């Protein structure tokens, strides 16, 4: 008997000789797989107050025949009672197993099924792999459809989801290969990951106005999906959400960069040097993944987010300009870019994602901002050419950075504290920050703004070329000394003395 506990944790009690148990008052949750495979367990009493039974909590309890479930239970996880005699008895009594108005199991259903009124949720995996299911009527009053609720129902032809539904879980209709049409409720705010992945007969979908986020691979491999209505309310479209759809192929034929609602979804058809339009705010995950002919990318300062694996496996990519406007840089963004030799991580980034530069075998120099607090696992793994790391902060600040597993190439490189990555062969003449052919007070002012903003930890918008032009003494950083040299240079030239930079420095 459990006492003085408030929760039974994941995989808590895999005890082979446990025969009965009472979950006492005070416990509010039973974790995932908490009693899984306790094959001697025959009975369990769950006291009032428990609100959640986790995924597979009693999975594989092959002797469990008696379960007392109180009305306080609000959530029943995926396959919580799978392979128990208790569930088998329930299935023999009805093809729809309903507990506390929650539809837990319908795996033995076939044909067209009408879910009864009063049901408030369809729980995770309730109809998963129910190949005999051809149609489903969901009553108004159902508010949620759980993860994988109808996944693998390959004969399910159409679904009308009532307006009462506000949440649809991950993979809810994944691989419903016979699904031809679906009506989504207007109250929906997000399409979760893999919601309709592999629905190969789906031809048209209207995403309701109000949806803000479309999850990872939400419609991936919906090969016949030709028509998609995406409202302006959508502000995030995750990795490969529409990949391998007829809609995406048609968009790529129109323009190698597919952009929707200021989100760059796909650029895999691009080659050579590419400039992303300044209307783009987000580069979605895997947007340029495996773009074998891409050699250079210029990212505008309108972009704030670059998703996971956005430029991964671009073997000819030698240069990329990431502006300081980017405040979110996903994992594996440049992994496998084997020709990349230098990289600058934007000033607003505080965490270096896992596998960020993994396998960048030609990477020699990298600039990291002073505000970073952690470097993810494998971020610089297999970067064997890395020799120099330019860190914007002090050695003391670097010592506080948490560096994850498999980053020996990073920690073994030469650290340059308080310095920026030097620009070799800068395109702007020394001192001419606006590249207008003359060196005057406007250039001095631009350098002063850069130094002031950098000191305050802010982004001045100064480009690498401008920074290189302002580094008068060539010590790898721009500071008050460089500004002094510029002032002296302008003053002498104003007095008619045509001195060189070497004269000024000496």
What is the role of each PLM region?
Residues 421-506:
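Cellulosome-associated attachment modules in secreted, modular CAZymes
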């Amino acid at each position: 008997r459990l006492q003085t506990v408030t929760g039974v944790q994941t995989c808590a009690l895999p005890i082979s000789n446990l025969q009965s148990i009472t979950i006492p008052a005070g416990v509010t949750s039973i974790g995932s797989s908490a009693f899984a495979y306790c094959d001697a367990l025959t009975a369990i009493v769950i006291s009032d107050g428990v609100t959640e039974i986790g995924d597979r909590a009693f999975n594989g309890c092959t002797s469990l025949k008696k379960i007392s479930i109180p009305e306080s239970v609000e959530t029943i996880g995926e396959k919580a009672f799978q392979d128990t005699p208790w569930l088998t008895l329930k299935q023999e009594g009805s093809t729809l197993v309903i507990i506390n108005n929650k539809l837990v199991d319908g795996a033995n259903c076939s044909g067209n099924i009408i879910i009864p009124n009063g049901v408030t949720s369809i729980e995770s995996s309730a109809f998963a792999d129910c190949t005999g299911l051809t149609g489903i009527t969901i009553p108004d009053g159902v508010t949620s459809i759980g993860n994988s609720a109808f996944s693998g129902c390959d004969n399910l032809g159409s679904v009308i989801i009532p307006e009462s539904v506000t949440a649809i879980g991950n993979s809810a209709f994944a691989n419903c290969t016979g699904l031809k049409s679906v009506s989504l409720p207007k109250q929906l705010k997000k399409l979760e990951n893999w919601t309709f992945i592999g629905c190969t007969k789906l031809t048209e979908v209207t995403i309701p106005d109000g949806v803000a986020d479309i999850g990872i691979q939400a419609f991936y491999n919906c090969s016949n999906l030709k028509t998609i209505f995406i409202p302006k309310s959508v502000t995030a479209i995750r990795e490969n959400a529409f990949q391998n759809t007829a809609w995406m192929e048609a968009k790529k034929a129109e323009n190698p960069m597919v952009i929707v609602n200021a989100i760059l979804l796909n650029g895999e058809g691009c080659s050579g040097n590419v400039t992303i339009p300044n209307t783009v705010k987000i580069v979605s995950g895997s947007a340029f993944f495996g773009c074998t002919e891409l050699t250079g990318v210029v990212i505008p300062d309108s972009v704030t987010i670059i998703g996971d694996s956005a430029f991964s496996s671009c073997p000819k990519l030698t240069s990329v300009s990431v502006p300081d406007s980017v405040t979110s840089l996903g994992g594996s963004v440049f992994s496998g870019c084997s020709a990349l030799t230098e990289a600058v991580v934007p000033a607003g980034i505080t965490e270096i994602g896992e596998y960020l530069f993994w396998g960048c075998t030609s990477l020699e120099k990298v600039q990291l901002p002073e505000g970073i607090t952690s470097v993810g696992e494998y971020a610089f793994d297999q970067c064997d050419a890395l020799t120099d790391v330019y860190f914007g902060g002090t050695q003391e600040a670097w010592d506080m950075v948490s560096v994850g597993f498999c980053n020996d190439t990073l920690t073994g490189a030469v650290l340059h504290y308080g310095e920026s990555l030097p620009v070799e062969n800068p395109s702007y003449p020394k001192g001419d920050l606006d590249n207008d052919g003359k060196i005057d007070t406007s250039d001095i002012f631009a350098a002063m703004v850069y130094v002031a903003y950098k000191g305050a930890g802010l982004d001045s918008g100064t480009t690498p070329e401008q920074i290189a032009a302002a580094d008068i003494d060539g010590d790898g950083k721009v500071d008050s000394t460089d500004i002094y040299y510029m002032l002296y240079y302008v003053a002498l030239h104003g007095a008619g003395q045509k001195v060189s930079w070497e004269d000024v420095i000496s």
